[in-house]
């Protein structure tokens, strides 16, 4: 579970969160890169997606625009408020204020569980992964986008694969060094895991 201090930190970050090229996807080229990446690993739409730790809902909205039905979860009230403002009254996208580590979503109901830059920040990561896998329908896909940043935060790809093995869900890594995803050159490790 996450703490009140964590929640306040992300509430404070919410107003400027989308300024990062890979968060707001405001640059059409960055948005197109993420669209193409996600569509290459997701089953064809329509499908049901749980976007856990959704932030301001940018990826959820991108996927809803592609024909997916998306339930997004974030524990930051301010992030959820901004996500709801972006998504309006769409019927293909809902935003829930809750902890991504223990989302109040139906087991076995999702074709995809998507988490971007979330797992690294959570305690008891193996238990969290097991819960996320429990949300998947038969044949469902767990898609994790993580990194090991120069700030010292994050998880290496190898560490993420080990956690997935411990959770009983082996994965495959695709490294993402291309500036197209981040809006700039990067020197840290960033990757997607499909499990």
Regions found by a protein language model. Give the residues of each.
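Short alpha-helix
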Residues: 153-168
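A short SAM/SAH-binding and catalytic strip from SAM-dependent methyltransferases
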Residues: 112-125
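Conserved S-adenosyl-L-methionine
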Residues: 170-180
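Conserved beta-strand signature within the Rossmann-like core of class I S-adenosyl-L-methionine
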Residues: 140-147
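A short acidic, Gly/Pro-enriched loop at the edge of an enzyme's catalytic core
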Residues: 101-112
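A short glycine-rich, Lys/Arg-flanked "PGG" loop and its adjoining helix->strand segment in the class I
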Residues: 126-138
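Class I SAM-dependent methyltransferase SAM/SAH-binding core
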Residues: 48-52, 56-103
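Conserved class I S-adenosyl-L-methionine
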Residues: 1-45, 151
């Amino acid at each position: 579970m996450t703490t009140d201090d964590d929640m306040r930190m992300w509430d404070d970050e919410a107003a400027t969160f989308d300024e990062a090229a890979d968060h707001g996807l405001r640059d059409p080229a960055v948005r197109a890169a993420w669209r193409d990446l996600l569509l290459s690993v997701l089953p064809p739409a329509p499908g049901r997606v749980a976007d856990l730790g959704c932030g301001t809902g940018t990826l959820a909205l991108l996927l809803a625009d592609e024909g997916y039905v998306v339930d997004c979860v974030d524990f930051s009230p301010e992030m959820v408020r901004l996500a709801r403002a972006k998504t309006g009254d769409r019927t293909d996208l809902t935003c829930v204020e809750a902890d991504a580590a223990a989302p109040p979503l139906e087991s076995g109901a999702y074709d995809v569980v998507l988490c971007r830059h979330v797992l690294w920040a959570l305690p008891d990561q193996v238990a969290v992964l097991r819960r996320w896998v429990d949300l998947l329908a038969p044949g469902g896909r767990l898609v994790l986008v993580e990194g090991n940043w120069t700030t010292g935060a994050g998880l290496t790809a190898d560490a993420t694969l080990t956690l997935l093995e411990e959770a009983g869900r082996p994965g495959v890594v695709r490294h993402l060094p291309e500036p197209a995803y981040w809006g700039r050159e990067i020197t840290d490790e960033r990757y997607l895991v499909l499990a």
